[in-house]
Design a protein with these regions (language model features):
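Alpha-helix-loop-beta-strand connector modules within alpha/beta enzyme cores
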Residues: 12-38, 85-101, 142-159
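Hydrophobic alpha-helical hairpins/lids featuring a short glycine-rich hinge
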Residues: 49-92
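Aromatic/hydrophobic pocket-lining residues that form the small-molecule binding cavity
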Residues: 19, 23, 55, 82, ...
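Glycine-rich, proline-tolerant flexible connector loops at the mouths of alpha/beta enzymes
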Residues: 1-23, 41-47, 70-81, 104, ...
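Conserved anion-binding
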Residues: 84-117, 123
Length: 177
């Protein structure tokens, strides 16, 4: 993830930088690398929902300025918040990776995540990301989760795990099995 998420806001709020210029510089400096952005679905990079035409234009502009992969997610895993951004990203011809926000609750079972991955595949996702932003995914749970998702859809799967608990490397190694 080279752009998007909080980097856009941080450029403006804290660094007095133009986030679009930053993206263009990244693209120029990394001509042989794909630049991925983290996109909060209908929230784009902000903290509220935006109108569909704003979503469309933002995604189109991001693609034109150097984004190659759109990693699209909703923190609550609500597909309704992802549908428009996904359509807009697919229209650019860029890679669309839809992310599952991993959480540990009685509701969040492997079947729930597998069903979500199937929905994302139906939306036209090119790949799935298990986004473990709190670092709570354990190795054997990752193994079982990847198996469940692989049964639900035939898309490449990535794991993005933070090292908060120190388990990220072991988790990713077990998930690869």
């Amino acid at each position: 993830e080279g752009w998007g998420g909080a980097t856009y806001d941080s450029c403006i709020r804290f660094l007095n930088e133009d986030p679009w210029e930053r993206l263009r510089k990244l693209h120029a400096a990394l001509p042989n690398n794909k630049i991925m952005m983290l996109l909060r679905g209908q929230n784009l990079l902000g903290y509220r929902h935006y109108a569909d035409d704003v979503v469309d234009k933002f995604v189109e502009t991001a693609a034109k300025n150097g984004i190659d992969v759109f990693r699209i997610f909703d923190a609550c895993n609500d597909p309704r918040n992802l549908e428009r951004a996904t359509k807009a990203a697919k229209k650019t011809g860029k890679h669309v990776q839809m992310a599952i926000s991993y959480a540990v609750t009685p509701f969040h079972t492997n079947q729930v995540y597998a069903d979500l991955a199937k929905t994302y595949a139906e939306f036209g996702a090119d790949s799935i990301c298990i986004k473990d932003m709190s670092g709570l995914l354990k190795p054997y749970e990752a193994y079982d989760l990847v198996l469940a998702i692989k049964k639900a859809c035939d898309l490449p799967i990535e794991i993005h795990s933070h090292a908060t608990t120190g388990l990220s490397v072991a988790t990713e190694l077990k998930a690869v099995e």
